[in-house]
Structure formats: C-alpha cells, structure tokens
Amino acid sequence: MDKIVLTGGGTGGHVYPNLALIPSLQQEGFEVVYVGGEGDTIERRLTSPLGIEYHSLPVVKLVRGLSLKAVKNNLSIPIVLTRSIINAKKLLKQIEPSLIFAKGGYVSLPLILAHGKTPLVCHESDLSFGLANKIGKLMGGRMLTSNPATKGECVGIPLRQELFSKNKVTARRGLNIPQNDRVLLVMGGSSGATALNNAVVKHLSTLTKSFTVVHLYGNKNYTPPKRTDKYIPLPYADDMASLYAVSDVVLSRAGATAVAELSALCKKALFVPLPKGVSRGDQLDNALLAKSMGGRVLYEDNLDNLPEEIDKTLHSPPMKSTYGDTNGKIVAVIRDSISRGEKCKNKKQSQNGLP
C-alpha cells in the first residue's frame, strides 16, 4: 500500500484542504500519514479524531515587522529549521512514503526542504505563491493551484464534504437558535482577528437588533462579551457545517479556503481582508476573487460602516458556486506523480545495471 505524507498547519487554511483529501485518498487505497508542528497545534487537534498516524517537527513561523518580538522570533528560524530538516530526513527514511503532499505554510517547509528523491506535490490556495511553496517549486515540486491565473496546474481547493451535509432547520434546533431569527456568522479565522473582533463588539448592540450573532473569535488572547440569547461567542468550532447551515450572512476574513467554502455553499458573505502590513497581501487578492463571485468586500479602515455593509450583504444575491471535483483531480495527480517517480527510479537502476 502506497503511503502519502500530508503536511501543512498553523492555520485552518493549511489544514482543512488536507483533511478534505483524506477520505478520497483512503478510498483509493492510500495509507495517509500526517506531519505537523509540535505541541497543541490545530493540525494535531483536527487529525486526532481521524485515527491516522501523526508525526511532529519543530517549526517557527516568520513574523513580519521589526518589533523586538519579531526580531527575536526570526533570529531563531535558522537554528530551528536546521534541526527540523534533520528530523524530517530521519522521519522520511522511517516512513518511506511514496509521495509528499504539502499544503504550504511554514509547517510544511521542513519536509519540502528534506524531500530528496520522494515525489513532492505542493498545493497553493491563494492567487500568489507563499514562501514555502515558492521554495517547493525551486526544489522540483509539482505545483497545483486553485486559480487559472496562478502558474501551475489548476485543480481548485479541496473542500470537506461534511460542509454540505447539514440543513438549516436541523442545525438551528441543535444550536437552540429560533427558526425565524436572522443569523450573522462572524469568522476571524482559526487564529482570530483582533480588528474584526473589536469591530463586531463595538457594533454589537446594533447588530443584535437585526441578528443573532454567532461569533467565532479565535483562541488568541481575546475575551469576548458574555453570551446572551442574541450573542453566541465561540473560540472555535469543529462543526462548521452546522454554523454555515444556520447562517443568513457570513462576515469573514478573506482566507482562500473561507472564500472557496462560502462560494461553494452559495452564502451571502462580506469579506474583510487582512491588510498588507500584516500579511503578504494574499487576502487582498482573495477578496477581489470573492467579489467576482458575488461576495462583498469591506476593508479594515472602513469598519465603522460594518452594520450598514452587513445589511447590504443581507439584501444582496448569494455568492456563485464554482465548486468541482477537486479531490478527484488531486488524487489523479498524486497517482501520476508516484508513477513518474517509479519510472525515473527504474530507469536509473537500469542505467546502473541494477535489477
């Protein structure tokens, strides 16, 4: 049985597409192994219930900016990364996978750098390549993309099938939300979003006049107001299918996976992209893509207009779905890449006179 190593983590956008692929890979007879970061990471927590083999490597995220904290963090990267690459090489020798599928982000970088002769497939959800995938391309990885405008093989973004499994009535019963209420779902991303969280709280009295607000505020150092009948704060939700099902409007950061999920579900959505100062600008690109699919966009410097923009979104058409058989396309690429790797290996053995 061929083993596939999936790697990626740190945020939901680098984990959920991998989770979406796992059932398809298992149905095709592959054994799946996940490699993520050390400690209580989102990738460890989300893969744990699946019962798949999990291995961890030491990783450090690049922090943008020139603050003392950022400088101290970034100075540790060469030391931690070197140790991680050494560990990754040992791990690959132990696992002997047929292929590595890297979802980008700093968690995937050690395996990208250590992959050696193991076939490498990298997937980029954003319109522009992140640093890890840029390195993956230089290291000979096969590049898959979510958009035809991005250089590579366009396959789309893998989406979890369970997202399509819930209906509004049943989901509202399960969450004790009245059937006639309008529901606003706020998603700041798995790491939270301080500016978005603060804007929601600032306008909460206005928003709760029109909506029951379900607020996914993230886990990082944020204390939301107390729960009421019209305000439901949650640090995180494993059952996103139910939350999507109950919502009439979604307020979200413009992560590529969030854009893909909300368009596939034909939701009414307002996106607040991360500004370029705290990111490489990928969410600004994603927001423009979302707008072309019927989503609305509000930039951080206009968050004072949040209630009005949410109301406009409520009375706008839903997003248009462009969802296709992404999983099938990726599984086909994986099979082809394994086959190419085996042919290359056999050719070299033949040239060297080996059986």
Q: Which positions does each model-derived feature cover?
A:
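Active-site-proximal region of nucleotide-activated glycan assembly enzymes
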Residues: 3, 31, 39, 53, ...
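Conserved nucleotide-sugar phosphate-binding/catalytic loop shared by glycosyltransferases and other
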Residues: 3-11, 26-80, 300-303
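A short, glycine/small-residue-rich beta-strand->loop->alpha-helix junction that serves as a flexible
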Residues: 6-19, 194
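Donor-nucleotide binding loops and adjacent catalytic segments primarily
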Residues: 40-46, 50, 65, 168-173, ...
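Structural loop-to-beta junction motif characteristic of Rossmann-like glycosyltransferase folds
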Residues: 52, 118-119, 248-249, 266-274, ...
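Glycosyltransferases and closely related glycan-assembly transferases
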Residues: 86-101, 108-121, 134-138
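Acidic donor-binding loop of glycosyltransferase active sites
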Residues: 97-99, 245-260, 267-268
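C-terminal alpha-helical cap of glycosyltransferases
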Residues: 308-312, 323-355
